[in-house]
UniProtKB/Swiss-Prot annotation:
The protein's name in its UniProt record: ATP-dependent zinc metalloprotease FtsH 2
Cofactor(s) it depends on: Zn(2+)
Source organism: Bdellovibrio bacteriovorus (strain ATCC 15356 / DSM 50701 / NCIMB 9529 / HD100)
Matches recorded under Gene3D superfamilies: 1.10.8.60, 3.30.720.210, P-loop containing nucleotide triphosphate hydrolases, Peptidase M41
Transmembrane residue ranges: 8-28, 100-120
Annotated NCBIfam families: FtsH_fam
Active site feature: E419
Keyword Transport in record: no
Segments on the Periplasmic side according to the record's topology features: 29-99
InterPro entries, per database record: AAA+_ATPase, AAA_lid_3, ATP-dep_Zn_Metalloprotease, ATPase_AAA_core, ATPase_AAA_CS, FtsH, P-loop_NTPase, Pept_M41_FtsH_extracell
Record function comment: Acts as a processive, ATP-dependent zinc metallopeptidase for both cytoplasmic and membrane proteins. Plays a role in the quality control of integral membrane proteins.
Family: In the central section; belongs to the AAA ATPase family. In the C-terminal section; belongs to the peptidase M41 family.
Tagged with keyword Hydrolase: yes
Pfam family name, one: AAA
Length: 615
């Protein structure tokens, strides 16, 4: 509660107290309180006059002052009771309960609660963006960073060189807009940064502001829409009005998909009209926006497929910049940027770490370096070395070690042969990711063991034989259990899910079926993010085709299972030897794995169907 409101309450209660004291003090000095029995005696004697009778009291005056009082007051008593008490010669009076404070609280307390609630919400709204009170609910609430407030530059952003080159034009425009107008060119009104989470979209936007040394307005799409109708549109207007006053500047809207979803989609419920109204206002502001005003609009999203087409047309967000996962060179650059923040070992091989972190985003790499530093801290080391990074990668990829999860001897044996089956199949095929470590120490939520494979290079395409090899590697654990123990366990459930997904993709998405031919049976739905089970659910085929697809998937998996069984049977001695070493050591490193796999026998290089077709 601010100072004026606090003073108001003090003054209010002070005035109320003064009136109450006056009524109690001065009233008691001029009026005598007498018993009802005395009042009856005075009436019989004719010593009272000017009576005022109310429901509970009788007020009057003495004809002759008594004890210095001219007036009196008494509480009324029921006539029958008064007559009975008078007959008994008893002095009596009636006490009236004082309800002043109760009556006062009955209306003061609710009023105070209402005022307190009002002031609480008013203060909450005031805290948002430095605004003052509920009357400022239509303010945008964007966080403003002054010209020198953004400490990020392009030197702090690595691994996204193409995106940096695109955005460098924005910096040049903000610094010297006349250069772009020399030949009649204009800067795009809006630039949309698109990419998976953690790739550095927000960091890039801050770097643009830091390089250009201009004010930077930052707000998320969800901050525009509130419970009050019309608030979102008002905040959009206020944001652009502030930006025009402080031009040149940058407006950055993070998570644009929260604000710019396609309008009129069936199934949208509460707040739908409010969101559409807010989006319409944003579209109107972009239309009336002059690209020469010195205000650049940047936005970021990882779900461009849900954005309204009107938002992406030319003249609004007319340039899209892809901020993708970094490649090996990009990961190496990101590692070098973040390694400056820790005490790394001078002998650390950054290039090797870049190979180990395939698929990592910039945020993942930053988290990896922090985890590695924590691992080194726990072992009381002076610097962070490569072993710390490997341990951190295992923790991130496979989960935390669960040494307290004790397995019995049979379960340990099953897990050891299961993981060794994966490792043998992975080492048989040159195109499969290299095995770096095998462990039977439980990790994460449900993994009782793991075979760590990391790619040696970035891959963007996979051939049909490589996908079939991958299925064989995944089936290696289940087939090894069956070969050694004559039965299977539930440990391969996750492997079988991945096997089914790959086989289904071969048939329905990639047109790699030898029976059904070059036909795609599931159309992509356009999802940018790779969500498991989503993105390819538009079915466009008959029940007969569905039956043929199921048969082809079963045939592919069966052929790969047979190939896996033959390969493991040919290397049964290595399977048993490797499992025994795992049971003894619990973990096998890459050199130990290479030594173990020297005498592998390559058996049946192609699945059964391919061999039949080649005859």
């Amino acid at each position: 509660m601010n100072e004026p409101n606090r003073n108001f309450f003090w003054i209010f209660f002070l005035i109320l107290g003064i009136f109450w004291l006056q009524s109690v003090w001065f009233g008691s000095r001029t009026v005598q309180q007498i018993p009802y029995s005395q009042y009856e005696s005075l009436v019989k004697q004719g010593d009272v006059q000017n009576l005022i009778v109310t429901e509970n009291h009788i007020r009057g005056e003495f004809k002759q002052p008594q004890n210095g009082f001219k007036s009196f007051v008494t509480n009324r008593v029921e006539p029958e009771l008064a007559k009975e008490l008078s007959g008994a010669g008893v002095t009596y009076r009636r006490e009236i309960e004082n309800t002043f404070f109760r009556d006062l609280l009955s209306w003061v307390v609710p009023a105070l609660i209402f005022v307190a609630v009002f002031l609480y919400f008013s203060r909450k709204f005031a805290e948002k963006g430095g605004m003052s009170g509920l009357m400022s609910v239509g303010k945008s609430g964007a966080r403003l960073y002054a010209e020198t407030g953004v400490k990020v530059s392009f030197g702090d952003v690595a691994g996204v060189e193409e995106a940096k080159a695109e955005l460098y034009e924005v910096v040049q425009f903000l610094k010297s807009p006349q250069e772009f107008g020399r030949l009649g060119a204009r800067m795009p009104k809006g630039i949309l940064l698109v990419g998976p989470p953690g790739t550095g979209k927000t960091l890039l936007a801050k770097a643009v502001a830091g390089e250009a040394q201009v004010p930077f307005y930052s707000i998320t799409g969800s901050e525009f829409v509130e419970m009050f109708v019309g608030v979102g549109a008002a905040r959009v207007r206020d944001l652009f009005e502030q930006a025009r006053k402080n031009a040149p500047c940058i407006i950055f809207i993070d998570e644009l998909d929260a604000l710019g979803k396609v309008r009129g989609v069936a199934g949208s419920f509460g707040g739908h009209d409010e969101k559409e109204q807010t989006l319409n206002q944003l579209l109107a502001e972009l239309d009336g926006f002059d690209s020469r005003s010195g205000v650049v609009i940047l936005a970021a999203t990882n779900r461009p497929e849900v954005l309204d087409p009107a938002l992406l047309r030319a003249g609004r967000f007319d340039r899209q910049v892809l901020v993708d996962r970094p490649d090996r060179t990009g990961r190496e650059q990101i590692l070098r940027v973040h390694l400056k923040k820790i005490k790394a070992d001078e002998a650390l091989n950054v290039e090797h770490l870049a190979h180990l972190t395939s698929g990592f985003t910039g945020a993942d790499i930053a988290n990896l370096i922090n985890e590695a530093a924590m691992v080194a801290t726990r072992r009381k080391a002076e610097t962070v070395n490569e072993k710390d990074f490997v341990a951190a990668i295992e923790r991130i990829v496979a989960g935390l070690e669960k040494k307290s999860r004790l397995l019995n001897e049979k379960e340990k044996a099953i897990v050891a042969h299961h993981e060794m089956g994966h490792a043998i199949m992975a080492c048989l095929f040159p195109g499969v990711d290299k095995v770096q470590k095998i462990s039977i120490i439980p990790r994460g939520l449900g993994a009782l063991g793991y075979t760590m494979q990391r790619p040696t290079e970035d891959r963007y395409l996979m051939t049909r034989p490589e996908l079939l090899d991958k299925i064989c590697v995944l089936l290696g654990g289940r087939v090894a259990e069956e070969l050694i123990f004559g039965e299977v366990s539930t440990g391969a459930s996750d492997d079988l899910v991945r096997v089914t997904n790959i086989a289904e993709a071969l048939v329905t998405r990639y047109g790699m079926s030898e029976v059904l031919g070059n036909i795609v049976f599931e159309q992509p739905t356009g999802n940018f993010l790779e969500v498991p089970g989503a993105g390819y659910r538009s079915r466009t085929y008959s029940e007969k085709s569905a039956t043929e697809i199921d048969q082809e998937i079963r045939q592919i998996v069966a052929a790969c299972a047979l190939r896996t069984r033959e390969s493991l049977a040919a290397n049964l001695s290595i399977l048993k030897k490797g499992a025994a070493q795992l049971l003894e050591k619990e973990t096998l490193s890459e050199p130990e794995i290479e030594l173990l796999m020297r005498d592998l026998v390559v058996k049946n290089a192609a699945p059964q169907r391919e061999r039949d077709l080649s005859v």
